């Protein structure tokens, strides 16, 4: 199988001009706001024109259609924000971040949100940044009695709220998306197809299973404005984790407790796979591993994907966790 790539810089296809100079391409896809990144390493012998910051790179990777069914799969748009040169041998490394993350999302704001649904809040924030909102059906009507945004960016606020309800939030292709974590949804909120990973596709595997989770229950607190008292909410039974945070209402406190308990459950198993390159795998995608052994066989949700093309071929590395119960 012959790896293939296509790179479009500022809407101009530059694939042929860099084909002979390419040393490697690495694309990292993370769930949530962690930030997707691109690294392109080029030979600089003889010297080429010094690259420019701010270039917009569209990247597609895959295999030759005559030898593999994948073809080229678009991996997104990236803005070059770092250029490195080293040697000998002389090489350039262009590093870029996904263009979806607008800088305005990082600017601090101070305001309060009262009597609003999570869907309406995300929609309002999206509109403020000239984006469209996509919120999972199970999250849209989640009621927020009160939340303060004090010298806090919209990015941090949304990440905080998503964590409280066991969700992930990510800007993709002009959308601001919030969907339940671990439910294998695409960036536009649609269900991702289940991808089967067979033993012959796996170059290396590593699974870690901790002895047992530390906690079987979570207690969170909320402030009752009528009684002026701090009330407790417990989810689960057994060894208890006690949250220090006090939430605005009982509903928010219970959702936060459920999300935290699920986090403890997910941390018991961690899977890493190195695969024959598969450009269709993405963060939050769901895979079914077959042909190995328990507890590796079965369903997993991808948290991180690294695609790499170099002189060794095309490989895909993934980190995954068990799906939501």
Predicted regions, residues:
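Acidic, small/polar-enriched beta strand-loop surface segments
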Residues: 1-5, 159, 171-263, 275-308, ...
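Short beta-strand-centered interaction patches in the first periplasmic/extracellular domains
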Residues: 91, 98-100, 135-202
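Amphipathic, non-transmembrane alpha-helical segments in extracytoplasmic/periplasmic proteins
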Residues: 38-40, 96, 110-134, 149-172, ...
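Extracytoplasmic
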Residues: 2-4, 20-22, 33-37, 54-56, ...
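Glycine-rich, small/acidic residue-mixed loop/short-helix segments
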Residues: 313-325
